[in-house]
Amino acid sequence: MLHVILRTCDRHSLVSTRIVNKKECILRCLNSILTNLESIEYKSLHIIDDNSSYDFRNKLKSIVEHLPYVTINYLPGRDQTGLSAKKKSRYSVQVAYQYIYNLPDDDLVYVVEDDYLHFPNAIQEMVDTWNYFSKFIPFNIGIFPQDFNQLHLHPAFNHNETYFQSCFVVPSHQRYYKTTWFTQESFMIQSKLFKQYKTDFDKLLNIGDDPSCWEGNTISSVWNKPDVKMFMPLGSLVVHMSDKTDIPFFISKKQVIKLWNKNKTFWSLEQDSQVQL
């Protein structure tokens, strides 16, 4: 069984240089997830909406209400005076993890942020790769869907000494994957791994309070445990529609726009559909 956990919010953005309209981005990224899930038999999609606008919630509901495998938890409003955008997002992370901690141990969980635009068959490939690697790699396997630029050594990057580390590369049936010490907040692992390392995952809730906390010393500490191997594809399964610097290597502007256009919904308006690349 695959559980996809998607956190949505149209009220604030962590990226000021976002390349697309945030509301439109969420709907198109959701559509790409729904298209991916069509071919997966045993699945659920649980959406945690963090106090989005009334209009957006109605749009969200209209897109998924006919799908029996989708549930939505609409979080109520709360006092967030003086909180940074990053800190505001921690509450929905907490709710998501509480949900995951109650799932069956052996089920797969794909936690995904609302600005990941998926290529066709991306999620099926993640599941297939997890199953394949689990047969001959004697570790708990994780899949990070993004071919994240900063995890490659590059002369234009300012933080090579932080992000770039040695790895090993394994071929799957579709492409090569490399081990990674780091992920952002979108990844797929078994539910039991969340429970085994609950203390490490819960440290993610401190981001926004403690300036020293980031993905690299919270959730990524799990990927560096002796019983865990996290993999990322060499050739991205998603496009992170945030800043243009996040567009993966060898993914062209034409490919991004084609994927973006392919996932428009009946709510899409021309003025909200521009991609700034």
Could you tell me what each predicted segment is?
Residues F119-D202:
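Conserved catalytic core of nucleotide-sugar-dependent glycosyltransferases
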